[in-house]
């Protein structure tokens, strides 16, 4: 591991009011974009076979140019509410983990409330934690329910293809990676404990290894404004890959120690799959059979905070995850953050 930081010990979850997952959803644009589509559009020196060999992706979804992420998010939210037979005005809180959102302010989660027709002035806000954002939201949601909320809606993902590269310059290290998708999850109150452990961390060692430059650091007189400010920058992809694999081992072991479980007690093992090979490397590191997990990177690409929830939904939709099963759910973001939870589905 590159980092020399000390990772904190786990703290046992001390909850008096329990949460459970009522429903979940995935919403993707209709437009399918293949590797060949990208190669032809940008006249790149690459082949579909080479792209699949290097990162394991076949296709991804792109949103229409006039689409906003709040359009996708509101649909994902509606699906969650319908599946749980919960009305929008019953929500106590909405939190969205974004990459960009519709705009910088106000929060995109507020726009979702507007599109859902919510008539109550409930809290709604956005956070940013890259690919690990959804585990942060899950941790927050179970604590909000512990302190009095009845229904917490959490949302993740974005129209991240627009940050793969600009029209002026195409970066072949990132242009094939990104895909557009969002996810939703509705949590409610339970009489029994479902969430058994939670562990989150950040590691500033990796701050400069995956980033989007735009910010006050770039908006000064010594820097020329450029579209490159909005590009996803990844100076060393192998460092990010290894940080994810290392994070997987660290977080999984912290969670298992917290619950006194072993991997044999885990029915479903979910983690973020920034590439197909990163997912496989994590399973190999933990000696987890592929049948216990899922990766949809080959189909949707890097959907940032939606990565792990999409894999979870795949296990649900295919019947491999059933109520009562034990899930180890993790996500690792941009090298600089990560975490996970163990819960009974």
Provide a role label for each language-model segment:
Residues 57-58, 90-95, 114-128, 164-170, ...:
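Glycine/charged-rich beta-loop-alpha catalytic/anionic-binding loops adjacent to active sites
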Residues 2-65, 168-242, 250, 345:
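Condensing-enzyme catalytic core mediating Claisen C-C bond formation in acyl metabolism
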Residues 44-52, 103-117, 154-164, 217, ...:
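Acidic-glycine-rich active-site phosphate/pyrophosphate-binding loop
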Residues 37-40, 108-119, 142-146, 167-175, ...:
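A glycine- and small-aliphatic-rich helix-loop capping segment at beta-alpha/alpha-beta transitions
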Residues 146, 150-181:
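Flexible, glycine-rich active-site loops centered on histidine and acidic residues
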Residues 76-92, 250-267, 315-320:
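Phosphate/pyrophosphate-binding loops at sites that engage ATP/ADP/AMP, CoA/4′-phosphopantetheine
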Residues 2-7, 70, 74, 100-101, ...:
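Claisen-condensing/thiolase-fold acyl-transfer catalytic domains that form or cleave C-C bonds
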Residues 21-23, 51, 80, 91-94, ...:
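Buried hydrophobic positions in well-ordered alpha/beta secondary-structure cores of metabolic enzymes
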């Amino acid at each position: 591991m590159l980092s020399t930081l000390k990772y904190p010990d786990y703290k046992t979850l001390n909850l008096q009011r329990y949460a459970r997952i009522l429903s979940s959803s995935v919403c993707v644009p209709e437009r399918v974009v293949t590797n060949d589509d990208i190669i032809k559009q940008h006249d790149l020196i690459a082949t579909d076979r080479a792209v699949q060999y290097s990162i394991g992706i076949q296709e991804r979804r792109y949103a229409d140019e006039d689409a906003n992420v709040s359009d996708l998010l509101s649909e994902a939210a509606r699906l969650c509410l319908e599946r749980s037979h919960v009305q929008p005005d019953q929500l106590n809180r909405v939190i969205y983990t974004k990459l960009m959102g519709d705009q910088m302010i106000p929060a995109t989660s507020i726009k979702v409330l507007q599109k859902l027709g919510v008539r109550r002035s409930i809290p709604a806000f956005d956070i940013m934690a890259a690919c690990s954002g959804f585990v942060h939201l899950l941790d927050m949601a179970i604590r909000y329910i512990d302190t009095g909320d009845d229904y917490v809606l959490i949302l993740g993902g974005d129209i991240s293809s627009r940050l793969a590269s600009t029209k002026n310059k195409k970066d072949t290290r990132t242009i094939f990676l990104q895909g557009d998708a969002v996810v939703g999850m509705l949590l409610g109150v339970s009489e029994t404990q479902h969430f058994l452990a939670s562990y989150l961390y950040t590691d500033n060692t990796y701050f400069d290894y995956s980033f989007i430059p735009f910010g006050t650091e770039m908006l000064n007189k010594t820097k020329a404004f450029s579209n490159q400010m909005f590009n996803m920058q990844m100076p060393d992809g192998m460092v990010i890959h290894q940080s994810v694999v290392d994070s997987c081992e660290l977080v999984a072991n912290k969670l298992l120690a917290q619950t006194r479980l072993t991997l044999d007690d885990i029915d479903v093992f979910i983690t973020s799959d920034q590439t197909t090979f990163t997912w496989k490397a994590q399973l190999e590191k933990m000696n987890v059979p592929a049948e216990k997990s899922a990766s949809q990177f080959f189909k949707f690409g890097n959907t940032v905070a939606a990565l792990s929830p999409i894999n979870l939904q795949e296990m649900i939709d295919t019947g491999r995850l059933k109520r009562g099963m034990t899930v180890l759910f993790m996500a690792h973001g941009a090298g600089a953050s990560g975490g996970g939870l163990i819960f009974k589905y």
